[in-house]
Amino acid sequence: MLLNVLRICIIVCLVNDGAGKHSEGRERTKTYSLNSRGYFRKERGARRSKILLVNTKGLDEPHIGHGDFGLVAELFDSTRTHTNRKEPDMNKVKLFSTVAHGNKSARRKAYNGSRRNIFSRRSFDKRNTEVTEKPGAKMFWNNFLVKMNGAPQNTSHGSKAQEIMKEACKTLPFTQNIVHENCDRMVIQNNLCFGKCISLHVPNQQDRRNTCSHCLPSKFTLNHLTLNCTGSKNVVKVVMMVEECTCEAHKSNFHQTAQFNMDTSTTLHH
């Protein structure tokens, strides 16, 4: 009998203790902090129903940069029961930066670096252009002084052999129309000589002759073309059919101009 009474008393005491602890647990909320190893540590005794923001300045994680960081977790409702409360999920914890000094310094360094690259490239290009422009400007200035002051007899002028020997005598195709009065017009395909050849003039010479070269036909044929006319007589035209052209040199007297005879009965059309 006494044993039964003792058992009942012990059960009543245990029930009272559990009810008190349970009511105490409802008023209290669990707070969590982050230790140096990155694990959550549960702390009791806080009166607020939310997860405290923990300063993680001392963390040595590789993904954490400069500045102070905080951890934000979901708020826990204080009306939940003890069995429904759960530990905060790490997937729902977000890491954010509260100080932007590191980002500002990085942006400032990138801006200064880009400015240095731009100015150094511009200065380098400017030096290169100055180096390439100096010889041309110097030659132009020397030629200007020679023309203004008069070149002395012993002055030597530099010239490139490639520019002197460069000739451009080309054979260009064109359409030639051969016409005559009271005759039908005839159209043929021919070539003409066009280009630049070398000419040499030496002053104060006794013979006063110039050595000139002209772009002339070097290979050609003479064709006799008969025109269809209304009269009883047929008209025959002799036309030079040009195949190749070259620069040919010849000597001429001073102030003598070359004379070119052109048949008025032929017209040129490119």
UniProtKB/Swiss-Prot annotation:
Biological process (GO), any one: cell differentiation
Glycosylation sites: N103, N112, N154, N228
Disulphide bonds in the chain: C169-C215, C183-C229, C193-C245, C197-C247
Gene3D superfamilies: Cystine-knot cytokines
One Gene Ontology term of the molecular function aspect: nodal binding
Domain of life, per lineage: Eukaryota
CC per GO annotation: extracellular region; extracellular space
Domain CTCK: 169-253
Keyword entries, A-Z: Cleavage on pair of basic residues, Developmental protein, Differentiation, Disulfide bond, Gastrulation, Glycoprotein, Neurogenesis, Secreted, Signal, Wnt signaling pathway
Tissue expression per record: A component of the Nieuwkoop signaling center in the blastula. Expressed transiently in a broad anterior domain of the gastrula, including the anterior endoderm of the Spemann's organizer and more laterally the cardiac primordia. Expression is excluded from the prospective prechordal plate region and the ring of cells that give rise to the trunk-tail mesoderm.
Induction section of the entry: By nodal/nr-1 signaling and wnt8 signaling including the downstream effectors mix-A/mix.1 and siamois acting synergistically with either lhx1/lim1 or otx2. Also by acvr1b/alk4.
Localization annotation: Secreted
Ranges that cross the membrane: none
Pfam name, any one: DAN
Signal peptide from the UniProt entry: 1-20
Principal subcellular localisation of the protein: secreted
Function: Inhibits wnt, nodal/nr-1 and bmp signaling in the embryo to promote head formation and anterior neural induction. Within the endoderm, acts as an essential mediator of nodal/nr-1-induced cardiogenesis in the overlying mesoderm.
UniProt similarity note: Belongs to the DAN family.
Subunit description: The long chain interacts with nodal/nr-1, bmp4 and wnt8, thereby inhibiting their function. The short chain interacts with nodal/nr-1 but not bmp4 or wnt8.
Misc. remarks from the entry: Microinjection of cer1 into blastomeres results in the formation of ectopic heads that contain cyclopic eyes as well as duplicated internal organs such as liver and heart. The heart beats at a rhythm different to that of the primary heart. Based on this phenotype the name 'cerberus' was chosen after a mythological guardian dog with multiple heads.
Official protein name in the record: Cerberus
